[in-house]
């Protein structure tokens, strides 16, 4: 694209764009983590984080990606030989399974096609067949397929039973409605580089009293991820925290609070609706049977090299999207509408997609995708 100045747009489901106001916080002087000044910042930040989890329970921070928080959940809840139910409908459901295997759990797997969403009825059936199961591991937003589950409905099933409900909300938090306490979700994990609009490197976890009951009984080895140490030192950190990431998280939480969490959820819904309208107008098919507000997974049309779509969009037009993972590599592409993204970012991504598909020989009327996305925005913003 030598004729034009190429700007860069991250439209992948993590890392996502980081606002300049948050980047500026990260550039501030690093202060010592054991000073009263920093402990005060840490307390303010972790208390503010309760708002996005919609919980009264403490939120704890690790210097890790979301996978670290996932491992913390398994290590603190599961003892070797414990029976657990794991929903596997994508790459990150597989990660729950692999973590539970690493800690010696007796796994009951609910295996679904990638793109399907587990139902509350399937969870209830698995629990009825396995009343001795101690934990149910779910993925709220399966980033690899663009699928969101009925977490509220599942929580209605589990909260009346002697089982702990865990969800991976790494990509969902801040994009999908999540009301931890009201719904009865027992443990939630997330990461910084998605809906929280931060660089990678920080993970958050919150759990209720029901989950703490298993934490106290767990016989699994744990050290850095031992939640008992974090509870004991709260709001301080038992180990050296990611100081500048905490600055950035504080600013991100302020921005989310100013916008209002319900407005944040609604913004993500609108961007998701526009993206799906655009790809359908192009004659493309969604992978997910229950798509959500985080990312849209699209099947590569017949006769098109799926690996070329993200490559051309990135290298020629400066728009970074994601391809498929694992067995979906080359078969789908994924356009995010997550975190610090606007309607015009979405329109830019759809325009770059159209130009890329046209170059690859896919037949369609140029502009129909952009027009469909604009129609969604017009309806939402000006009532047309």
From Swiss-Prot:
Family the entry assigns: Belongs to the class-V pyridoxal-phosphate-dependent aminotransferase family.
Xref: InterPro entries: Aminotrans_V_dom, Aminotrans_V_PyrdxlP_BS, PyrdxlP-dep_Trfase, PyrdxlP-dep_Trfase_major, PyrdxlP-dep_Trfase_small, SP_NH2Trfase/AEP_transaminase
Pfam family, any one: Aminotran_5
Record keywords, A-Z: Aminotransferase, Pyridoxal phosphate, Transferase
This protein's record includes keyword Transferase: yes
Record-listed E.C. numbers: 2.6.1.51
GO MF term (any one): alanine-glyoxylate transaminase activity
Name assigned to this protein: Serine-pyruvate aminotransferase
Catalyzed reactions: L-serine + pyruvate = 3-hydroxypyruvate + L-alanine
PROSITE patterns: AA_TRANSFER_CLASS_5
Annotated source species: Thermotoga maritima (strain ATCC 43589 / DSM 3109 / JCM 10099 / NBRC 100826 / MSB8)
Chain positions found as N6-(pyridoxal phosphate)lysine: 194
Needed co-factor(s): pyridoxal 5'-phosphate
GO biological-process terms attached to the record: glycine biosynthetic process, by transamination of glyoxylate
Annotated disulfide bonds: none
Described purpose of this protein according to its UniProt entry: Involved in the degradation of L-serine via 3-hydroxypyruvate. Catalyzes the transamination between L-serine and pyruvate to yield 3-hydroxypyruvate and alanine.
């Amino acid at each position: 694209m030598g004729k034009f100045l190429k700007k860069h747009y991250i439209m992948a489901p993590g890392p996502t764009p980081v606002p300049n106001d948050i980047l500026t916080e990260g550039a501030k002087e690093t202060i010592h983590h054991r000073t009263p000044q920093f402990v005060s910042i840490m307390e303010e930040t972790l208390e503010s984080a309760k708002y996005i989890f919609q919980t009264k329970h403490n939120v704890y921070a690790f210097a890790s990606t979301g996978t670290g928080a996932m491992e913390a959940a398994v290590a603190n809840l599961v003892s070797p030989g414990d029976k657990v139910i794991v929903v596997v409908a994508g790459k990150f459901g597989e990660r729950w399974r692999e973590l539970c295997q690493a800690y010696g759990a007796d796994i009951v797997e609910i295996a679904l096609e990638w793109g399907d969403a587990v139902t509350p009825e399937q969870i209830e059936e698995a629990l009825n067949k396995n009343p001795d199961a101690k934990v149910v591991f779910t993925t709220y937003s399966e980033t690899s397929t663009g699928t969101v589950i009925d977490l509220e409905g599942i929580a209605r099933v589990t909260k009346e039973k002697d089982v702990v409900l865990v969800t991976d909300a790494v990509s969902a938090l801040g994009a999908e409605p999540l009301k931890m306490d009201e719904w009865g979700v027992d443990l939630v994990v997330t990461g910084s580089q998605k809906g929280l609009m931060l660089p990678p490197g920080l993970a958050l976890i919150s759990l209720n009293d029901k989950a703490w009951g298993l934490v106290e009984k767990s016989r699994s080895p744990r050290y850095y991820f031992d939640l008992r140490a974090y509870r004991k030192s709260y709001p301080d950190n038992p180990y050296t925290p990611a100081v500048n990431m905490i600055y950035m998280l504080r600013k991100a939480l302020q921005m989310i609070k100013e916008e209002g969490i319900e407005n944040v959820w609604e913004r993500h819904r609108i961007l998701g609706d526009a993206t799906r309208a655009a790809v359908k107008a192009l004659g493309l098919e969604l992978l997910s049977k229950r798509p959500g507000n985080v990312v849209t997974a699209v099947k590569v049309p017949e006769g098109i090299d799926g690996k070329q779509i993200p490559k051309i969009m990135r290298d020629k037009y400066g728009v970074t999207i994601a391809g498929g993972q694992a067995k979906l590599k080359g078969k789908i592409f994924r356009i995010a509408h997550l975190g610090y993204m606007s309607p015009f970012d979405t329109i830019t991504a759809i325009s770059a997609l159209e130009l890329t598909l046209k170059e690859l020989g896919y037949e369609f009327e140029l502009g129909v995708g952009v027009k469909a996305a604009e129609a969604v925005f017009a309806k939402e913003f000006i009532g047309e």
